Every structure is written in C-alpha cells, then in structure tokens.
C-alpha cells in the first residue's frame, strides 16, 4: 500500500462523513461552523446506530443501512422543518458572512496534526505495536467477517459465551466501512481514521467549543486551534498509549457535545438560534455516536458540563415563582440521581480499575498547570494562555469566564486525583469510570483546558490592541492588518509546537516502527504473515500465542485464529490445544479439540511478547506431529499433521 492509498481512504472517509452527517445536520438547520462540527458527530451516531439496528432488519454491515438511517432521519427532520415553517412564521436571521479567521484557525492545526500523524505513522500501512491494538485490528476483521458492526456483537469475538455483552464498536464499524469502500488493508484504513479524527474532527470541535463559550472573535478561534495542536495529551497520547482508538474517537466528538449542551442550556456566548425541540435532537445526534465510540467520553461530558447545569439552576432559582423553583429543584435532583446511576452503570469492573498512583500531590498540580501530563515536558504556549485565562476570569468575572474556569478546574482535579490522591475509595469514586488510568484523564483534561486558554489569548489580545492609539490603528491598511494577523496566527501555532509535542511524537513514533525486535510483530514475523494467505486455506484456523503477535494473522492475513486476543475466553477445547502447544505434544483429547475448532496450522513467534518475555511454544520444533511449512528468521509456520497418530 502507498501513500496514495492512504490519501484516497482519507478522502473517502471525509466524503461519506460530509454527505451523510452533513446532510442530516443541514436538514436539522445547522449552518457554518456548527454544520462542519455536527457532520462527524451525526455521522458517528447514524453509523453506530445503524450498526445496532441492521442485524435486527437482516442487513449485513455496509454503507446501505447507514444510508437508510440517514435518509430516514434527514427526511423526517427536513419535513418537520417545512411543516413548522409554514405554520409558524419565523423571524429571519441574517446570514453570517464567511469568516476567513475561522478557516485559518482550522487549516493551521489541521495541517500541523496531519504532519504529526504522518511523522508518527512513518508508513501508510504501519500499525501500533501495542497490546490493545491486537483487539482493535482484529475487531475490524471480525466486523467484516460477520457483517455485523453492532456494539452488542463485537464482544463475541473474545467472549463467545456472551459475557462481554457490550463493547463500543463505532470505531471498528467506520474502519470496516473504509475497507469495504476502498479495498485498502485494515492498517491503512485505521490510519485514515487516525488522521481524520486527529486533524479533522478534533480541531473543528475545539474551535467551536471555544467560540461558543468565549465568543466569535478571531483570536478565540486561532488560539483554540493552536492549543488543539499543541497539547499532546490529546490526541497524540491516545495514539501512543494503549492504543486507545475508541476513546480518542469519543473525545474528539466531546467538544461538539459540550458546545451543544452549552447552547441548549442558554449559557452560550455564541450559538445558533434553535427551538428547544431542535436542540434536543441535535444533542441526541451529538451524544449517541460519542457514547458508542466510548462511554468514557459520555462520562466526561457529564463531568465537564456540570458547571453549565449549575449555572442554569442558579439562574432559575433567582426567578420568582415557587412552582418554577420547585420544578428546577426537582429537575436538578433528577439530573444528579441519573448522573450517579450512569456513573455506576458505565463504570468498568473493579479488576480493571487498579492503576497505581504515579506522582505526589504537589508534582501533580505543577504538571497540570504546565500541561506536561505523561510526557513531563511543559506545553509552554497552552500553559501561559491558561494562566492568562485564569487572570482575566478573576478580572472580568463574567458568567462565561467562570464557566470556562470551572470546566478547567474539574479537568485538573480529575487528573490530580488519578495520579496523586492517596485515598483509594475517594480516588475510585472520582476517576473509576476511566479505569483510574492517568492517560485517559490527561486526554480529558486537554478538552477541559482548551476554552480557558483560548479566552486567555483573546482577552490579552484585546487588551494589547486597546493600548495602541486609534489613529495608529487606522493608518494600517486592511491588507496589512490581515497579513499581520495571519503571521501572528502562524507564530502562535508554531510556538505551541515547542516543548511537549516533539517528545510525544518521538515516543509515539517508536510504537509504529516495525523492526527485527518489534514488541508485537517483528519484520520477519510480518514477512511470514504476508505469505499466509497463499499457504493456509481459508477454512483453516491458525493457533499461536497472541502475546507474541500471532493473533494478528486474523487482521493482517485474513485467516481465522484460535485466540484473537490475549484476553480471550478460554473454553475446554482452547485450553487443551494451548496446553498441547506448550508441551509440543497433542494427545487424543487435544486432537479432538483441534479437529472440532478446525485448528490445522500453528504460528510460532518465539518468546518475545508485547509485554516482555513469554513462555512461548518451545517444544514445537521437536514435535513429530507438526510439519514445518514456512519460516522467516525465527518465525515459523507449522501444519498440524500428526493428530491421526494420537490415541
């Protein structure tokens, strides 16, 4: 696969996002930047929703069920708008002029993030050599094989008994669509998704959220774009650690959901004029796909939107009328109860929440202020802008400024708690919904700090501009002012790249480089996998240690594997087969199990595992029941030929 294949996959993903998500957003009545930010959110909701509904309708996974759902929702929305428009005349709203500064604010971070993604990937078909990627790459293959992308189905790949009843599958469903529509490999389709989410969805949502809270000023948009590309805890960290692709998708959609919540609650500085019913529909379109991308993003929405909800409650309680106040209190209590219940329902099991503390309380606070989460190098520009935002909040004391500061405090508090709070029960109460895992909270913190940083930049720019005499400003030609503004925007984005970003790119890049000593799949092992489709029949199942990377024969070579992930449900047959592979000897029971599961080939990728040395299958080379078919370096492919001799 070439870079042209990757560019084509990116183009296809952008096209279907614009056509499907954009058309529905247009039908709902969104325009301009709101339309641009809504398109990927609506596309995610429509795609993930269609994936759940399609099996009930007897439809296999493809663009067809997605298109059907989009036409239904868009058509009904457009029809309602026409009928309502005829019955109730609306006050015409003057159309907004094209804002060149928004375009610049989006183009600069998009270009920088594309560049950073390409640096990290290194090659169009590279893939992250990390533990979680075994599941994510194989999950896409499972969607393609079963023609089912439902979040109620993906868990069956590793838990055939149904014990994993729900696994957020929005990411895997979209990547599968890319494979279907373009014919590229799963790694190339995954990389196309990485680029679109990181350089497209994220900066658009970030700029929209900042403008919604801090106002539609050019400096707000420019600063938001610079910060979006300048704090590597999101999105780069989630490309490095894990990898956490589904959470990255969900958090990239989070700013739009927050902006919708702010607009719907009536505490926005800048938002479209929509009736309550349309706001509710837009909110549903925002949170559906985000939640099915990763529930952790929805819990983050609950946490970061709390200041807005409290502001609305306070405003309502100040109004006269005991009935209004009683309804407000009842609604707020219902909100709290629902939030607590959702936190418990969406919380992962206790065994998955055991991540340890990593910093002292003082160091954690300094890390949060410096924006140096995980990489321990300050994000200088963002840190300065946040401090300016705090200062201007204390000076201006406007409602919107307090909301941005409150959002920042919540994000910082969650991060400090997860890395430093030495009270286990209290720590788990606050951050257990995100596995008590520092990288997840660091990524959420970036969303929380971004509006305040943009506000700090814009308010400082306004103050500095006011210091320039009016006659001096008037003497500057318009073209010169625009050129100076563009230069300042480029400079800010460039300065935001100083500090943490280069280290983050360096660390993340190492996980995408395939070498002779790669943690998951070495260059020799990959070479053997590329020949697998010529040597292993489609009907056969391949056994191998998933910790050594053998499980990726499923995603990379399109051959079924006995263990598609390291954390797979082990039944009696799998247990017997794995035990036989460890010993290099298949008894009658193990042979029966192998025959029942169609296991006819074995990959031996040695004792180098993704998390360090593993036991491996050391006895395979001496087994009379296995015949060597192919080898590349230390990687070997065997055929199980001697089971008829057992028993």
Question: What is each stretch, according to the model?
Answer:
Residues 309-310, 381-408:
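Hydrophobic, aromatic-rich transmembrane alpha-helices
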Residues 57-64, 123-129, 236-249, 354-374, ...:
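Membrane-helix boundary/interfacial segments in multi-pass membrane proteins
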Residues 331-338, 401, 460-501:
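Signature aromatic-anchored transmembrane alpha helix within multi-pass, membrane-resident enzymes
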Residues 1-98:
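Membrane-embedded, hydrophobic transmembrane alpha-helices
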Residues 301-332:
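Perimembrane helix-loop-helix junctions
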Residues 12-18, 493-647:
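Extracytoplasmic
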Residues 109-252, 508-511, 516-519:
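Active-site lumenal/periplasmic loops and adjacent helix-entry segments of GT-C-fold
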Residues 264-288:
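Short hydrophobic alpha-helices at membrane interfaces in multi-pass membrane enzymes
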